[in-house]
Amino acid sequence: MRRWLTSRLYDAFLVAAFLAAAPRIFYKVVFHGKYINSWKIRFGVEKPQVKGEGPLVWFHGASVGEVSLLEPLLKKWRQEFPDWRFVVTACSEAGVYTAQRLYAPLGATVFVLPLDLSCIINPVVRSLSPQVVIFSEGDCWLHFLMGAKKLGAKAFLINGKLSENSCKRFAFLKRLGRSYFAPLDLLVLQDKVYKQRFMQIGIPEDKIQISGNLKTFIETETSINNRSLWRKKLKLSPSDRLIVLGSMHPKDVEVWADVAQHFNKFSTKILWVPRHLEKLKEHARLLEKAGISFGLWSKEDSLLQYDSLIVDAMGILKDLYSAADLAFVGGTFDPLVGGHNLLEPLQKEVPLMFGPHIHSQSVLAELLRTKEVGVSVDKENLLEAVENLLEDEKKRQAYIERGKSFLKNAGTSFEHTWEILKSQIACIKI
């Protein structure tokens, strides 16, 4: 009875949230063309199909970052368990695009996650009948999880984390927090801080293991420095200094636009990479307002013509980082966002900068600051911090070396996570 009531209340909450967001969704559909290609699956009109026979593992991540970190895990699973079928879902269209690019060539079925209303997601879960469900970082959905468990599936959270704000909300509604995560068989978390937070909302300690942060993992074949290749592609001269501003939101653009023209004395080029392409016009308007002349990647404009380019393309941010002399991770000047993946620039051996709002990964950001791996900036010291790094190659190299050391020391996370999951897979009856 309690589970039925929880489910109905949860359905009611989702409907209310959807109605509240409906005007914004309508705006994105009409003016940006979003959700047009995915609405049939989102609303259960069209059911996804998985070809072939054999056991099925279903991976899920919210968006680009959560989906991308699954890559070494999925490749390893495919290598050691070739008879399994793979499904990868994401909530955002950017996440689905990334999953298709990374995992469709490996034979995975990729689609957007249907809405978690019981009448929509439950038939999909029953149809696919997964043996294993793996959630990336924390994007668990109650009906999806409960439906899979009813069918006897094992459910795991990997690279798990719980922000301080989420912990407070779940602690206030401790029964809901316990109900929300209790069906999980195992939570593989990033560190002890997140372990304490999950325990505060009622998750027993024997369901928790710590493996480290999967985003520190670098595959040998993908860790080759593509710096020369991409600098040549970008038409950069040896004397040019390139700043890559990744995953940018409008508030990040506002801050950087105020200082960008002060870097000309260093022969500086800037790539502005929006987090959401539907915000492209707003990004362009902010640069125009600041008097910054810029080109567009999609028009094949080059850094020979402009000192700034807006990269209105998906899936190339990591490659662009490899060409940079300095990288900034966006969302960190926007208190409503709280940052994105801080480790991508380090993986490409580039000095890292981020703003003051990093609550989405505050534990990692504090660790990076403490070990002097990343440079934390605010509006007041941004110009000075950038100029200091641009004019001092030795200082930039010192940050690169500390970043390499940090990743090397943290780089056992994937092996640990895989061994934990492998021990669980061995117990699954197929």
Curated annotation (Swiss-Prot):
Residues reported in the UniProt entry to bind CMP:
274-275, 314-316, 341-344
Q: Looking at the keywords, is Methyltransferase present?
A: no
Q: How does it sit in the membrane?
A: Single-pass membrane protein
* Transition state stabilizer (site feature) positions: 137, 215
Q: Which GO terms describe its cellular component?
A: plasma membrane
Q: Which residues cross the membrane?
A: 12-32
Cell location: Cell inner membrane
The task this protein performs is described as: Involved in lipopolysaccharide (LPS) biosynthesis. Catalyzes the transfer of three 3-deoxy-D-manno-octulosonate (Kdo) residues from CMP-Kdo to lipid IV(A), the tetraacyldisaccharide-1,4'-bisphosphate precursor of lipid A. Thus generates the genus-specific LPS epitope of Chlamydia, composed of the trisaccharide alpha-Kdo-(2->8)-alpha-Kdo-(2->4)-alpha-Kdo.
What PANTHER family does the database record attribute to this sequence? 3-DEOXY-D-MANNO-OCTULOSONIC ACID TRANSFERASE, MITOCHONDRIAL-RELATED, 3-DEOXY-MANNO-OCTULOSONATE CYTIDYLYLTRANSFERASE
* Family the UniProt entry places it in: Belongs to the glycosyltransferase group 1 family. Glycosyltransferase 30 subfamily.
Identification of the protein by name = 3-deoxy-D-manno-octulosonic acid transferase
Organism equals Chlamydia muridarum (strain MoPn / Nigg)
Gene name, please?
Answer: waaA
